[in-house]
Design a protein with these regions (language model features):
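Hydrophobic alpha-helical bundle segments that form small-molecule/ligand-binding pockets
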Residues: 115-118, 129-154, 190-191
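N-terminal intrinsically disordered/low-complexity leader segments
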Residues: 1-7
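Amphipathic C-terminal alpha-helical segment
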Residues: 96, 111-114, 138, 158-175, ...
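Hydrophobic alpha-helical connector segments
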Residues: 71-101, 153-157
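Helix-loop "lid/cap" segments that line or gate small-molecule binding pockets
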Residues: 74, 92-95, 104-116, 140
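Hydrophobic alpha-helical segments that form the core
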Residues: 104-107, 147-167, 179, 183-186
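Short, basic, alpha-helical segments at the C-terminal edge of helix-turn-helix-like DNA-binding modules
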Residues: 60-66
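Helix-turn-helix
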Residues: 11, 19-58
């Protein structure tokens, strides 16, 4: 088996995460994902017997894992500084994509499958959001907040960032994101 074929499953999952971020859940077909991944269509179903839902659930998990790593890196220091770094990375992603790329985890969370398929991608999104909340809660707790306050702030931060990304994509303008980012950093720094 060539190296190109042996890494086909990873390329398929990565391509699916990109499609989720750009086009959403229902527009991400297995055929188009395989094409973008330059993977054989037939072998895609061999590697992913659960079909589209399995591919998209794994893509959602992969996207979440990448953000886990970014959060871990950003949140090594003080929470306000770490949040600023994380927001700067998201800001760059929005601008670099000309506002065409959003969060694949949010896409998996908010779209219902158009068929009666299981909602594996939504469940994967819920697990990812829970991990992000836990990371942020821990960082905010290290900064002296009570567990309850830290958890509430973590939920608000995630929801605010996701909403700001959606608003900036809709308006093709970084303004909504920048305003939300400034408020979040100010709120987290306010002790």
């Amino acid at each position: 088996m060539s190296a190109r074929h042996s890494d086909a499953p990873q390329r398929v999952v990565a391509a699916a995460a990109e499609m989720l971020a750009t086009y959403g859940l229902n527009a991400s077909s297995v055929r188009e994902v395989a094409k973008r991944a330059q993977a054989p269509f037939g072998s895609t179903y061999h590697h992913f017997p659960g079909g589209k839902q399995q591919v998209l659930a794994e893509a959602t998990t992969l996207a979440g894992t990448k953000v886990d790593a970014l959060l871990d890196t950003c949140l090594q220091g003080a929470a306000p500084d770490g949040l600023s770094l994380f927001l700067a990375a998201w800001r760059e992603r929005l601008i670099r994509s000309a506002f065409h790329v959003g969060c694949p985890v949010l896409a998996a969370a908010v779209e219902e499958p158009i068929d009666d398929a299981p909602d594996d991608a939504r469940r994967a999104a819920a697990e990812v959001f829970a991990r992000w909340e836990a990371r942020l809660t821990e960082a905010l707790s290290r900064g002296g907040r009570s567990p309850e306050q830290a958890n509430g702030m973590a939920t608000m931060i995630i929801a605010s960032i996701e909403g700001a990304v959606a608003m900036s994509r809709a308006t093709r303008d970084i303004g909504p994101f920048d305003r939300v980012a400034a408020q979040l950093v100010s709120l987290v720094a306010d002790r």
